[in-house]
Amino acid sequence: VLVLSHLHSGDTPSAASNKAQLESFRQVSAAFEGIESSLSASAGIFLGPEYHFDLTRPGIALYGGEAVNGMKPLRPVATAEARIVQIREAAVGGTVSYGATHQLERASRLAIASVGYADGYLRSLSGSGIPLRTGGIAGGFGFIAGHHVPVVGRITMDLTIFDVTDVPDGAVRSGDYIELFGSNMPVDEVARAAGTIGYEMLTSLG
């Protein structure tokens, strides 16, 4: 048995509702003497000890994600990678992926990775060809051989194409793994590129 509640605006430390909920929860939990109580998930933990009560419920904090937007007190520990199944040389003027939405402005080297939206790698991370994209969202990146490499064209059901032209020759080969998020690309930064939050990224992949 547990007296339980949840802060609806815990990820906004300045929200007056946090203090109001805290006081209400104190009154409720006091009415259940001898029963443990819990108010805070990850975001509430960072509001201070008064929000902790008998136990806390860390979720995204366990993965080193941002429980509070812009606050990065933890080291990211979750990593997602995809295997490169093919490297292709492509000529200037060629097009990439469905709809030919991305046209190459230079001779390019493209890495095709075995991950797509069926695996939870969000289609909104596509480099181009997403009609709903606004100016604030530029598309996704991968990380390999010390380089951030952009997604080009639309992410498909099972495959994603990365432009590895700027990675030195021989540094990327079929069979290598490309980081989708991890220590070099925090999940929350990738999520922002997709127009969403780290929670969705972590719960979608699989």
Task: Briefly describe each language-model feature range.
Residues V1-V92, P168:
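Active-site loop/helix belt of alpha/beta enzymes
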Residues A91-G206:
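C-terminal accessory subdomain/extension
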